[in-house]
Amino acid sequence: MPHYRSRTSTHGRNMAGARALWRATGMKDGDFGKPIIAVVNSFTQFVPGHVHLRDLGALVAREIEAAGGVAKEFNTIAVDDGIAMGHGGMLYSLPSRELIADSVEYMVNAHCADAMVCISNCDKITPGMLMAAMRLNIPVVFVSGGPMEAGKITSPVDGKVIAKLDLVDAMIKAADPNVSDAEAEEVERSACPTCGSCSGMFTANSMNCLTEAIGLALPGNGTIVATHAWRKGLFEQAGRLVVELCRRYYEQDDASVLPRSIATKSAFENAMTLDVAMGGSTNTVLHLLAAAQEAGVDFTMSDIDRISRRVPCLCKAAPATDKYHIEDVHRAGGILGILGELGRADLLDLSCGNVHSGTLGEAINQWDINGGAGEAAQKFFRAAPGGIPTTVAFSQDATFLTLDMDRQTGCIRDKAHAYSQDGGLAVLYGNLAEKGCIVKTAGVDESQWVFTGRARVFESQEDAVEGILGDRVQAGDVVIIRYEGPKGGPGMQEMLYPTSYLKSKGLGKTCALFTDGRFSGGSSGLVIGHASPEAAEGGTIGLVEEGDTIEIDIPNRRIHLAVGDTVLAERRAAMQARGEQAWQPVDRERVVSQALRAYAALATSADRGAVRDLSQLKR
């Protein structure tokens, strides 16, 4: 029978000093036999996805204590990728994932907490906490702050919504010289109306949906908007549930409730199956690979490639379409609705466990609105946006008049009526990416699935932006942005500005972009990232020259630099001859801090999730 971890610091005469300090935090005599549960919050006023979380930790804590536990809250950092975008701040985004994972480990292990409720939301916070949960392997429930409502532009005549907007629309309009200042300002003011994670199928929402599929979050976690009153129930339930999980593990020796028991290889495969089916952000590939490594699960790019070849695209939301946002996915039945369709297509392992419903199959039976779910589920998925700008959680209770249960032409489709039988994400291989690269096929126009173009080579994102805005990129080009990988950046910047500017220049469907960096979940078009190995690790992307021919073939999962092997060998030899300057960007001016240098020293390429390789410390 496992012992409560907290007894290490709460029991025995030798812990009198520790108990004295615990008492100073408010604990009483009767609390020292209860489980101590860490409420891992991530409130910050810097990030709209986290600005409303200040009081939600206390909400969870009250439920924990009412259920017989002791709640102790702390905060992690949280970087807003949208605010950090387009300048040196983006270098810090991906490395913050490791910092978050480490800080959770430090706090939980230093204070011997028995379990956690992880209150996450935005891009690197959910992955960082997920990595920590796998690492610590103590009972945990994830509950996110929830998605932002989509922005709306309404008709001045009848007030009806004539367009839905998000952050990416604001960026594209601002860069389009044909858009007036007044129109650009209207979009800017309308794009992000409420608290919550940005409203499309971007990285934050993708990851919060995937925690449902993995089994560590409650139904609706990824889709019910942050402002809706019914989201409060997820936080309350999480507080009660984590105490139950604690008792099952520590008092009943039930290890099935532990993260590593739930997040098995089959669970990661289920999550990736969902990811491909819903066209999730390409960043999810990095984060699932990283979390799997922390869990000790052998889940690799080859598994992702295999899954991507057999799973159809069953759901589309912005940026893959301007018709639907996350609030529309919720109205169509949320993640359990997509999982229900995948289950009926025999594409899931329904025996995988979760924290709330026994097995995935049981959860689908209870929550899939097209699979016979009851009145409670039917009501829950009618939770709608309120249409009122606010930074306050649970501030409205609007409901949709009807559910979207149309699986032929609706937001969520069944397999027979899939958006495409080829899934929403794909892994490409070739001499430009021997270890793979990632493309979000859900966001690529079918006319570009096979594309050949001329290389336009840039040594940094900044140079690429200057080149695109300076009209140095033309239709038919393949923009190469290199030395932006985990080591080369360092930090593997997102390329939302280059992709947005290509669209603003009318090149979104006539150009491609290939990089060892990564993309915001808001990027779409023929944009291919995560080139592995990266340029700084000797990847062939570092040998591409201006004007080279690049061949892209998504149906056959191929990306190829049309240069002979002899020529490539000569280029590689010439690069090696540069000595210490080999595999380094030419004439790039970039200040790299000591913190980022430390990250770069241990970072791996994207095919391994850009995690740290601690074996390098032994060299």
Swiss-Prot record:
Binding site for [2Fe-2S] cluster: 122, 198
Keywords: 2Fe-2S, Amino-acid biosynthesis, Branched-chain amino acid biosynthesis, Iron, Iron-sulfur, Lyase, Magnesium, Metal-binding
Biochemical pathway: Amino-acid biosynthesis; L-isoleucine biosynthesis; L-isoleucine from 2-oxobutanoate: step 3/4; Amino-acid biosynthesis; L-valine biosynthesis; L-valine from pyruvate: step 3/4
Binding site for Mg(2+): 81, 123-124, 494
Sites of N6-carboxylysine modification: 124
Named cofactor requirement(s): [2Fe-2S] cluster; Mg(2+)
Cellular-component GO terms for this entry: cytosol
GO molecular-function term, one example from the UniProt record: dihydroxy-acid dehydratase activity
Family matches, as Pfam families: ILV_EDD_C, ILVD_EDD_N
Assembly notes: Homodimer.
Task of the protein: Functions in the biosynthesis of branched-chain amino acids. Catalyzes the dehydration of (2R,3R)-2,3-dihydroxy-3-methylpentanoate (2,3-dihydroxy-3-methylvalerate) into 2-oxo-3-methylpentanoate (2-oxo-3-methylvalerate) and of (2R)-2,3-dihydroxy-3-methylbutanoate (2,3-dihydroxyisovalerate) into 2-oxo-3-methylbutanoate (2-oxoisovalerate), the penultimate precursor to L-isoleucine and L-valine, respectively.
Full protein name: Dihydroxy-acid dehydratase 1
